[in-house]
Amino acid sequence: MSDIKTAVITGSTSGIGLGMAKGLAAAGMNIMMNGLETAAEIEPLRKSLEDSYGIQAHYSAANMMEPDGARGLIEAALSTFGRVDVLVNNAGIQFVSPVEDFPDDKWQAIINLNLSAAFYTTKAALPGMKQRGWGRIINIASAHGLVASPFKSAYVAAKHGIVGLTKTVALEVAEQGITVNAICPGYVWTPLVERQIPDTAKARGLTEEQVKRDVLLAAQPTKKFATVEELAALGQFLCTDGAASITGAALPVDGGWTAH
Ligand code: NAD
């Protein structure tokens, strides 16, 4: 078997996941991409990873909302590359509404994708990591895994949940060369954030500009969105041996938000 490590990144066809895919490809890893964009949108991204970094990149359309999809993504990576060394649980969605109007199906979808998918992928990826005595699991949580905001009940519940899952699995595998950490970004300018601005504006009776300035960046003392490149740099570091003692941590990348 080749020494080249394989990274599986859920939701890596856009935003933070795509940034992570670039960061880990730049570190020399083969990449299993995943996401719901069309094949025509994904193929240039996949090819660009191979061309820019000289690694192999494959793509799976597995739906992380479904347990079989999450398990299937790990199986696809194992049958393509023979190993999963790094797992980044990143795919996530948002829905904004007061709790009493929050649709039941949106609650369930957010719990399934933002929390349960990481349970199924972790379960499927751990046996191989244990066998090799090395592994990295990085869960993309959120500042909302540490603190709450109104109108995001499902998202905040799922993100607090994934921080709990991170700590629990970290303890279970601590002696086996596997680290498990959560990255907790504040606001990062990606399609997910862009899409929630109209709904937040409606829920709070504000203009979209007011939402950006007075709601999103009001919480972020730096008054700047974090970048996907900053998150990828942390992801890269967590995959080095220098980060071997960082495990069970929830690491904020939030411009000081959770220091309040
Ligand atoms: P994004 O909307 O840009 O990308 C989401 C990715 O997930 C896409 O590749 C999409 O295809 C994929 N996806 C969506 N549903 C899927 C499904 N059912 N199965 C497989 N893939 C699916 O979002 P983003 O802003 O890059 O967010 C990525 C993660 O970072 C999410 O978990 C989000 O909660 C978290 N996060 C984002 C921010 C931010 O400000 N953008 C802040 C904190 C945490």
Each language-model region and where it sits:
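Substrate-binding pocket helix/loop in short-chain dehydrogenase/reductase
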Residues: 98-99, 106-111, 137, 216
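Short, small/polar-rich loop/turn modules that mediate ligand/substrate recognition or access, typified
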Residues: 174, 179, 246-248
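Short C-terminal tail/terminal secondary-structure segment
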Residues: 146-147, 235-236, 247-260
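Conserved glycine-rich cofactor-binding loop
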Residues: 13-15
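Residue(s) in the substrate-gating loop at a strand-loop-helix junction
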Residues: 142
